Amino acid sequence: MAKNTAIGIDLGTTYSCVGVFQHGKVEIIANDQGNRTTPSYVAFTDTERLIGDAAKNQVALNPQNTVFDAKRLIGRKFGDPVVQSDMKHWPFRVINDGDKPKVQVSYKGETKAFYPEEISSMVLTKMKEIAEAYLGHPVTNAVITVPAYFNDSQRQATKDAGVIAGLNVLRIINEPTAAAIAYGLDRTGKGERNVLIFDLGGGTFDVSILTIDDGIFEVKATAGDTHLGGEDFDNRLVNHFVEEFKRKHKKDISQNKRAVRRLRTACERAKRTLSSSTQASLEIDSLFEGIDFYTSITRARFEELCSDLFRSTLEPVEKALRDAKLDKAQIHDLVLVGGSTRIPKVQKLLQDFFNGRDLNKSINPDEAVAYGAAVQAAILMGDKSENVQDLLLLDVAPLSLGLETAGGVMTALIKRNSTIPTKQTQIFTTYSDNQPGVLIQVYEGERAMTRDNNLLGRFELSGIPPAPRGVPQIEVTFDIDANGILNVTATDKSTGKANKITITNDKGRLSKEEIERMVQEAEKYKAEDEVQRERVSAKNALESYAFNMKSAVEDEGLKGKISEADKKKVLDKCQEVISWLDANTLAEKDEFEHKRKELEQVCNPIISRLYQGAGGPGAGGFGAQGPKGGSGSGPTIEEVD
């Protein structure tokens, strides 16, 4: 088996990802930089060829010879309108060779031209090497994914790229199909299911509707926007900060490629941060002409900057539903794919569109496709492990799950590394005569005694008819579903009386007491946050007032309307305040307010004289928004009677 491992590769437009199925589960493999996704970039320099992170990191220094987006060229003719329109936006050169596009670069001092298949094969080679480094032996067999709308020539070209990379391509499968396999949606055994896959990646947006019946996948409809993705959101942030830099420093950095590239990298990082935090800060030293650029952005502002792009994702969803002749109520499963679906606003729009339906997002969205491809690869290699046989191969239970029996002994019902979903039932009985009820305490862990394991929850089954010890039969069932949500049910066989508990979120489980304690701490922190928020708000108000006053008196249109002395007075005071701000970023709220009053005393008389008492321009403080309330990251334990 070891030498015959097959891998699954998600060959993406902007990023690629590789996974392998072994030891009964899928491993998504990290590259040498520790990243689980690798940029689909290839760069050519005077001395070497770079692939992946190394290529993307030097793109600012070497844009003409850094190739990306090969997936937009593969299997297309040079005259294809898509190729013609994309060419306008690429920094590298695309040439025509017998109506086939080729990418022209300078490599080791010579001009070279490569077919898109060759560029893609370099990325595939990189993915193959990443897998080999992890597995410790050569790998040849692979399943590679393509968008559902790829035509035959694009599929064949992708397969050729695999062959060039030295891979035996077992199969080319559709990305949405791979994502559905990752979530085990083909194994629910519930008859025909309609699945909508919402795939918002780095460069493209695809909506697919699949019908799955008895393991057979049928693509019913595809829609989307081949030029909408994470990079567009980055661009909005870049433009926003270019404008901010103009406002603050009166300089336009948009023509300086290196500055824009550094800004873009910081924006991409900030965007990722905003999926989990409500505010992100950017710190770029010496961005342009020696000026350091330190700033921040809130999630709300980011959502506003991209609101039209986010909303536009729903149109293809409607189109796909129309084409599939389905109503939104007829969709059984919604699956999120692509890193950009981590954005909370995108999730909310989709969820609201489907009237609050749950989204499948327990697998990392940028890894779901490679995950499914790895599963498919294992099946095609005839992997006989029981996990693949009834492959609801979602995951495994990381720790044994069981309950406490007499004397504090841990009795495991579900052993660690069992494939989930799974269901186990065992009969227990009472410990003493006429015992009226039993306390079911659910634990996870490998130790023999429950006191050394982790308590997940407990519930009581009462109303057991009086009987000698050992007579009552209490049936306990542990049932974990594909998302790792555990349901424990206890039933008294004689009366049919039952009680259950649901434990969700197997990561960092917390007991009720801990949650309670955290709620109280959060209240305390909230008060501290409030003080901090007001402080930042006062600082921002002062800063923007100072900059506004400065621009007001420097306005060309005011030449001659304001005396040089007055102008100097305002500018000096503004400069003094701005310098003070830079030196005292951590001052208290009242200090900022005091400075503001000082500045107003200087500026107001001059500005009001200037506008004949019409009042100066407002100060428009940008109040920084702090994090919103509880984030619901703890587990929820619901008791059901």
Swiss-Prot record:
What gene is this protein translated from?
HSPA1B
- What does the subunit comment say? May be an auxiliary component of the CatSper complex. Identified in a IGF2BP1-dependent mRNP granule complex containing untranslated mRNAs. Interacts with CHCHD3, DNAJC7, IRAK1BP1, PPP5C and TSC2. Interacts with TERT; the interaction occurs in the absence of the RNA component, TERC, and dissociates once the TERT complex has formed. Interacts with METTL21A. Interacts with TRIM5 (via B30.2/SPRY domain). Interacts with PRKN. Interacts with FOXP3. Interacts with NOD2; the interaction enhances NOD2 stability. Interacts with DNAJC9 (via J domain).
Q: Where in the cell is it found?
A: Cytoplasm; Cytoplasm, Cytoskeleton, Microtubule organizing center, Centrosome
Location (main, coarse): cytoplasm
Sites of the modification N6,N6,N6-trimethyllysine?
Answer: K561
* Biological processes per GO annotation: chaperone cofactor-dependent protein refolding; positive regulation of microtubule nucleation; positive regulation of proteasomal ubiquitin-dependent protein catabolic process; protein refolding; regulation of mitotic spindle assembly
* Keyword Cytoplasm included in the entry's annotation: yes
What the entry says about domains is: The N-terminal nucleotide binding domain (NBD) (also known as the ATPase domain) is responsible for binding and hydrolyzing ATP. The C-terminal substrate-binding domain (SBD) (also known as peptide-binding domain) binds to the client/substrate proteins. The two domains are allosterically coupled so that, when ATP is bound to the NBD, the SBD binds relatively weakly to clients. When ADP is bound in the NBD, a conformational change enhances the affinity of the SBD for client proteins.
- According to UniProt, the name of this protein is Heat shock 70 kDa protein 1B
Instruction: State where composition is biased (Gly residues).
Output: 617-633
Record InterPro entries:
ATPase_NBD, Heat_shock_70_CS, HSP70_C_sf, HSP70_peptide-bd_sf, Hsp_70_fam
- Family named by the database record: Belongs to the heat shock protein 70 family.
Q: Which residues carry this modification: Phosphothreonine?
A: T636
